[in-house]
From Swiss-Prot:
UniProt source species: Xanthomonas axonopodis pv. citri (strain 306)
GO biological process, one term: uracil salvage
The keyword Endoplasmic reticulum belongs to this UniProt entry's keyword annotation: no
Keywords (A to Z) from UniProt: Allosteric enzyme, Glycosyltransferase, GTP-binding, Magnesium, Nucleotide-binding, Transferase
Gene that encodes the chain: upp
Residues binding uracil: I193, G198, D199, A200
Protein name: Uracil phosphoribosyltransferase
GO molecular function, one term: uracil phosphoribosyltransferase activity
InterPro entries: PRibTrfase_dom, PRTase-like, Upp_B, UPRTase/APRTase, Ura_phspho_trans
Keyword Ribosomal protein: no
Protein family according to the UniProt entry: Belongs to the UPRTase family.
Length: 210
């Protein structure tokens, strides 16, 4: 399985800022948006292109364009929505598919509650957006859902990932590519990433307990 930990200095600087427990909701949200753009840039570096001839200022010019159907972005509700604006800034024509799975805090297993996918998935690159790859259960369930709908080229973009989640993903879907700003140390006994970011959804939407 292809796993890319993006070591670009800007990415590492921004993920470090996100780890600050005193960071405001506004600051956290802005950094998540910026990291979404930077990580999507890395994740799309191997897209197929094709030649296209168009009018230029001095006559016809041949340029490169992305080949095939438009990319679909797949934010996992709700925290994945925080990454969506940054990725759309880079790929404004992308289609957006939305899935909702929440983790049962007792079993740590994903429970699906929403699915709205774009058509022609078999022709598209699908980029899953989720700030945290923890146990891998939610991600694996999302990939299962996408593959049942016809998706064949799937990548995941995460702010932080746990080794346990990466191992589980590789066992279930070794064909999926992973792009992350950081591979953290481990999961605690509640399935949270350490050192992690805290609850990314609460920090993005300002719903954490004071």
């Amino acid at each position: 399985m292809k796993i890319v930990e993006v070591r670009h200095p800007l990415v590492q600087h921004k993920i470090g800022l996100l780890r600050d427990a005193a960071l405001s909701t506004k600051g956290f949200r802005e950094l998540v948006t910026e990291l979404g753009t930077l990580l999507a840039y890395e994740a799309t570096a191997n897209l197929d292109t094709e030649s296209h001839t168009q009018p230029g200022w001095a006559g016809p010019v041949t340029v490169q364009r992305i080949a095939g159907a438009k990319i679909t972005l797949v934010p996992i509700l709700r925290a994945g929505l925080g990454m969506l604006p940054g990725v759309l800034a880079l790929i404004p024509a992308a289609r957006v598919s939305v899935v909702g799975l929440q983790r049962d805090e007792e079993t740590l297993q994903p429970v699906p509650y929403f699915e709205r996918l774009t058509g022609r998935l078999e022709e598209r690159d699908a980029l899953i957006l989720d700030p945290m790859l923890a146990t891998g259960g939610t991600l694996i369930a999302t990939i299962d859902m996408l593959k049942r709908a016809g998706a064949r080229r799937i990548k995941g973009i995460f702010l932080v990932a746990a080794p346990e989640g990466l191992k589980a993903l590789e066992a279930a879907h070794p064909d999926v590519e992973v792009y992350t700003a950081a591979i953290d140390d481990h999961l605690n006994d509640k399935g949270y990433i350490l050192p992690g970011l805290g609850d990314a959804g609460d920090r993005i939407f300002g719903t954490r307990l004071e």
